[in-house]
Amino acid sequence: LSVALPANAAIKVLATTSDWGSLVTELGGDKVNVYTATSPLQDVHRVDAKPSLVARARSADLIVATGAELESGWLPVLLQESGNSKIQPGAPGYFEITSALRLLDIPTAVDRSMGDVHALGNPHVQLDPRNIAAAAKALSTRLAQIDAPNAAYYQQRGADFQARWQQAMARW
């Protein structure tokens, strides 16, 4: 799964939301260069795959998406237009947060009368702090896989984050 990067190059990460952008920054420190596709005030369901965003995807080493079809209205177009084989589904540089989690609210049946329903389950996983811990663990592992020479760095930052996060959860 390792991607060849120059020795001092930071991993270029495109995160679909500011939540995941912040988490990648926390886990990757100075080894990552993070760009977030959306602002906290944007509806992540509806984003335009503008040329500037396509250019970011074209040069990315890793894309971090929520998954569970949250970004289905724009992410597939962005990935296709980027022409970047490193960040296509199934590639090491494509990571869906929900792949590390158990989704809730999975409907047993979906039809048009139900309106806009998340057929794969509730993708708004960042609302549960326990999901952040699980996402951080999986994401630090993925960073270590992509940038193997710095694997220990990502593992240490992941462990440090877990300790701080568990302390914060105990206070909540």
What do the predicted segments below correspond to?
Residues 5, 9-172:
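Extracytoplasmic metal-acquisition and chelation regions
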